[in-house]
Amino acid sequence: MAAAASTLASLSATAAAAAGKRLLLSSPSRSLSLSLASRGRIAVMPHLRAGILSAAPRRAVSASAPAAATIAVGDKLPDATLSYFDSPDGELKTVTVRDLTAGKKVVLFAVPGAFTPTCTQKHVPGFVAKAGELRAKGVDAVACVSVNDAFVMRAWKESLGVGDEVLLLSDGNGELARAMGVELDLSDKPAGLGVRSRRYALLAEDGVVKVLNLEEGGAFTTSSAEEMLKAL
């Protein structure tokens, strides 16, 4: 009788092992529970296992900073640090928009790029030629800003033969253009210009915009020195 019981127990164990193998092949989640149970450990329930797997780290999605509102008449110019060379062999210098405009009447105009045709042939030469007339109307300084590095701006100044009439400033990282909301994305153009600044000319008194001639894109219709003189 004892031998029969032993044989029956052996057959049951063999059947259980075979069933375990079938479970292992057909259901990985069940095999995990069976394996833990066979070792005397607590089985991981299916719903708990699903929760553990779903708790894998997820990549955080950061929202991009909202674009700045486009500058308008009556606005205070945002502060930014611009760089320049005051002479061919001089040291690199920086000036903030705040320091440039504090307590002064300043004409600031922007171009999409140094050495580009319209900027080189019309926009900058026009302000160089009219700088004296602008000063006669109370303007303390005339400055051109572009999203180019300071070395390019120095080379451009030398090629144009610009003296003290107009200060050529580098907004190399586009800090001022972004803060003013006047970015101009030219990434789709074959010249490789990337993101630049829209063309504009403005008059600021103690940092507050009094006159603003902002072009659509890189057009050149209202931002000339002549148009600024008419507005003064």
From Swiss-Prot:
The active site is at C119 (cysteine sulfenic acid (-soh) intermediate). The keyword Nuclease does not apply. GO terms for molecular function: thioredoxin peroxidase activity. It comes from the Eukaryota. Keywords: Antioxidant, Chloroplast, Oxidoreductase, Peroxidase, Plastid, Redox-active center, Transit peptide. Its EC number is 1.11.1.25. Residues 71-232 form the Thioredoxin domain. Residues 1-62 form a transit peptide. The keyword Nucleus does not apply. CDD domains: PRX5_like. InterPro entries: PRX5-like (IPR037944), Redoxin (IPR013740), Thioredoxin-like_sf (IPR036249), Thioredoxin_domain (IPR013766). One of its GO terms (biological process) is hydrogen peroxide catabolic process. PROSITE patterns: THIOREDOXIN_2. Belongs to the peroxiredoxin family. Prx5 subfamily. This is Peroxiredoxin-2E-1, chloroplastic. It comes from Oryza sativa subsp. japonica (Rice). The lineage of its organism: Eukaryota, Viridiplantae, Streptophyta, Embryophyta, Tracheophyta.
